[in-house]
Amino acid sequence: MQINLNLKEKASSYKIYINELERLELKGKVGIVTNAKVAGLHLEKLLSVLKCDEKFIISVPDGEEYKNLTTIEQILEQLFVSKFDRSSTLIALGGGVISDMTGFAASIYERGISFINIPTTLLAQVDASVGGKTGVNNKFGKNLIGSFYQPKAVFCEINFLKTLPKREFAAGMAEALKMAITFDKEMFSWLKSVNLDDENLAKLVEKSINLKARVVEQDEKEKGLRAILNYGHTFAHVIENETNYKEFLHGEAVAIGMNMANRLSVRLGLMSEAQAEEIKQVLVKFDLPVSYKIENEYAFYEAFFMDKKTKGDKINFIIADKIGSAVIKNDVKKEDVLETLREFK
């Protein structure tokens, strides 16, 4: 199955392939960026189908805490030592962290070389690998250093998801639910009752990618519509930073963030209490956390100002006003936000 992502700059458009990895044929040097855990599960499969002139394995540490400039420098050093040039290609074999770092390294090596995403987690297949967001974290916050840089192609293998731990799978469901809650109430209703067997899992990936692709086509650089896909993330990024990226997986933090955003929406008179509870119960159904103990609501609030979506003294909150619809609010009173945060003390 193929999904086309058609961007205004036609040279940046690309295809997303589902269960068609055998199509992968490249020229020149190829660097496969992965980590030891993913390599042990999926590298053999990739090497068995990959057709190229010369291949190199670039192993990086596993974990969000290693998504930083130090790791990027390690990747770049291996590219220089191996004499990669502008005709070379990087392959991201892994989850969202691998995808983000590989894309960023590709975007800055010799001012840009090609890269291909082969996402191995549900979170990466339904979200992180599609759309061209790349980057790393630093002490000031998440993804504050990065670029928009589109892959040449994305290859999603549904069988790769069978090796995921239950917690990793749930984290991916948070991103799929995010898209359903903000853009597609029918998809949300489907997820409420679906049994995710192999067939429905493939449908979930297809539905999510189609949604993401259509949004990116309209707003590649996140000037408006695409920002809606940051629903839950304004809160999530603060949670991740406060816990040094060690307590929650990204999707888990997003699930908590969506619940927090919904509580704010209810307080503002946008979302009904019933729908906020309905969403919360679906998050719980997929084994996602919905609460986080906030020690200091004032410090939490101030951390919002390090978010990329903040403009000057205006915090852009992405808020679902009902299932299947969301708005961007930059006029939320500080006290309304603080009162919402106090619900989680």
UniProtKB/Swiss-Prot annotation:
UniProt cross-references to InterPro entries, sorted A to Z: Dehydroquinate_synthase (IPR050071), DHQ_synth_AroB (IPR016037), DHQ_synth_fam (IPR030963), DHQS/DOIS_N (IPR030960), DHQS_C (IPR056179)
Entry EC no(s): 4.2.3.4
Enzyme class: lyase
Subcellular location: Cytoplasm
Keyword field: Amino-acid biosynthesis, Aromatic amino acid biosynthesis, Cobalt, Cytoplasm, Lyase, Metal-binding, NAD, Nucleotide-binding, Zinc
Pathway entry: Metabolic intermediate biosynthesis; chorismate biosynthesis; chorismate from D-erythrose 4-phosphate and phosphoenolpyruvate: step 2/7
GO cellular component: a single term: cytoplasm
Cofactors demanded by this protein: Co(2+); Zn(2+); NAD(+)
Main location, first listed in the record: cytoplasm
Pfam families: DHQ_synthase (PF01761), DHQS_C (PF24621)
A GO MF term: metal ion binding
Residues involved in NAD(+) binding: 62-67, 96-100, 120-121, 133, 142, 160-163
Cofactor: how and how many bound: Binds 1 divalent metal cation per subunit. Can use either Co(2+) or Zn(2+).
SUPFAM superfamilies: Dehydroquinate synthase-like
Coiled coil: none
Chain positions recorded as Zn(2+) binding sites: E175, H233, H250
UniProt catalytic activity: 7-phospho-2-dehydro-3-deoxy-D-arabino-heptonate = 3-dehydroquinate + phosphate
GO biological process terms held by the UniProt record: amino acid biosynthetic process; aromatic amino acid family biosynthetic process; chorismate biosynthetic process
Record's function text: Catalyzes the conversion of 3-deoxy-D-arabino-heptulosonate 7-phosphate (DAHP) to dehydroquinate (DHQ).
Protein family membership: Belongs to the sugar phosphate cyclases superfamily. Dehydroquinate synthase family.
NCBIfam families: aroB
Protein name: 3-dehydroquinate synthase
Organism (species): Campylobacter concisus (strain 13826)
